[in-house]
Amino acid sequence: MMDTPEHASTSSRRQLLGMLAAGGTTAVAGCTTITGGGDTTSTGGGDSGSSSIVVGSKGYGEQVTLGYVAYELLANTTNATLVDETGFGGNAAISEAYRTGNVHAYYDYMGSLWSSHPPKHDSADFDTPDAQYDALKSEMESEHPIRILDRADWQNTWAVFVAERAVEGTGIQSISDLAAHVNSRNYDIRPAFGDGFRSRSDGLDALLDYYEFDPERVTAWASEREFLETASAQAAGTAVDEGYADLGVGYSTSAWLTDVDSVRVLDDDRNFWPFFHPVGVVHEDVATDAVVAALNTMPDAIPDAETMQALNSRAAASGNQQAAADHLQNNDFI
């Protein structure tokens, strides 16, 4: 699961809540590898000095794939000996790991680092991704033995999506438009959301409050359309696709969103959720020019959310490492 932000009480404040994620790894050879005992090691090529680098990630699908993007870039462009610790754990585990040198390199999200890694912030009041990035980089590099590398231009945050059939002729393009629709006593759109999402601090009820949905209208809406709580965000997408619901909430780069036909992603026009752009994180002990250059390839290799979404879909079919290696090779990054 992705790390998620928390709702704020005013339109100018955005609060974040970091969630732990854990999971396994997929190891498919995309370069010269030696496997054994659960770890994968590789001796890369290129012109950096030889050193040992532990490559990590958090545990869910996109994070593991990004971990293997880092692994393949380092394996193919440096002389480092690599240790595969993709799927290492959630925020608490991986933040402890890079502070102690047990993980040297991985990609994380700005919102996760800001909210869930020491010193941890309960709020983020940034108008642009660059403002959040600058504050994050300054603080994290002064607090920890790491460097924050270049950020990508895309982000993986929550997305509100609605079936085209349900909004045809309404002009609904944004969450504010949806609020106006419901506040005008239109209850025709049935929402679906994952287990527990409605009451989360960054979930549906908080979103409705932030966007000033009239509480009486929301009560009437829920009574008339019976909000559908599903087992997961992906199941909510399936409910929309199969006509059991009209509106869902999921992750913006999830592979399953590509399988849902005829949906419209609504603009979070008041920035309820903050900026979750990926950035490279590297321990200062291994931050040579070659290592930094390799890891800074990611924003070019994955230039937009659509590319990440497609990569997630391929990873689900062929495995995280194979998908990462194929993508980098096919686009001449390794």
Curated annotation (Swiss-Prot):
Query: What keywords are assigned to this protein?
Result: Cell membrane, Chemotaxis, Membrane, Signal
Gene3D superfamilies noted in UniProt: Osmoprotection protein (prox), domain 2, Periplasmic binding protein-like II
Q: Which residues does UniProt assign to the signal peptide?
A: 1-29
Give the UniProt entry's GO cellular component terms. Answer: ATP-binding cassette (ABC) transporter complex
Localization of this protein: Cell membrane
* Chief location: membrane
What's the superkingdom here?
Answer: Archaea
* Topological category with respect to the lipid bilayer: Peripheral membrane protein
GO biological process terms, alphabetically, are:
chemotaxis
What is a GO molecular function of this protein?
Answer: transmembrane transporter activity
Family note? Belongs to the OsmX family.
Name the job this protein performs. Answer: Mediates chemotaxis towards compatible osmolytes. May function as a receptor that binds the osmolytes and transduces a signal to CosT. Has probably no additional role in transport.
Q: What's the protein here called? A: Chemotactic signal transduction system substrate-binding protein CosB
Q: Origin organism of this chain?
A: Halobacterium salinarum (strain ATCC 29341 / DSM 671 / R1)
